[in-house]
């Protein structure tokens, strides 16, 4: 697949990389829209040691499920992948899961690529009346929301 790869401070390349292999409980998403976050810019400038090169950045994304029972569904992605088993996850506070991961930070590649894999529980369906360009903005809009 094609991906935009962070190669080091102020260096990116558009190149062919290996297709992602979905783990159990993960699905393959064909990325159709992705935002550029301030954290992507910090990484690009070399100001984020949590994002070492080479790495595919991008975590504000929307696309289409391209396999399994939900093949063809339009979705946006919650980029925070939690364990789903700890007390924080059990009380709806996945943001403080001690084992949390975020796409675009190792060990998870990001969405500046044709495809990304993500747990099915991290997907939110996008109604057909909303564009996937708008759906890619759900993550930054949801940053300040918690029930």
Each predicted region: which residue ranges?
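Residue-level recognition of beta-strand termini and adjacent short loop/turns
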Residues: 8-10, 23
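Short Gly/Pro-enriched turn/cap motifs at secondary-structure boundaries
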Residues: 7, 18-19, 52-58, 104-108, ...
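Cytochrome P450 core scaffold surrounding the K-helix E-X-X-R motif
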Residues: 39-45
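NAD(P)H dinucleotide-binding glycine-rich loop of Rossmann-like/cofactor-binding domains
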Residues: 83-147
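Short N-terminal binding/cap micro-motifs at the start of the first secondary-structure element
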Residues: 10-14, 38-39
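Glycine-rich beta-strand-centered segment in the early N-terminal region that forms part
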Residues: 18-34, 47-87, 127-130
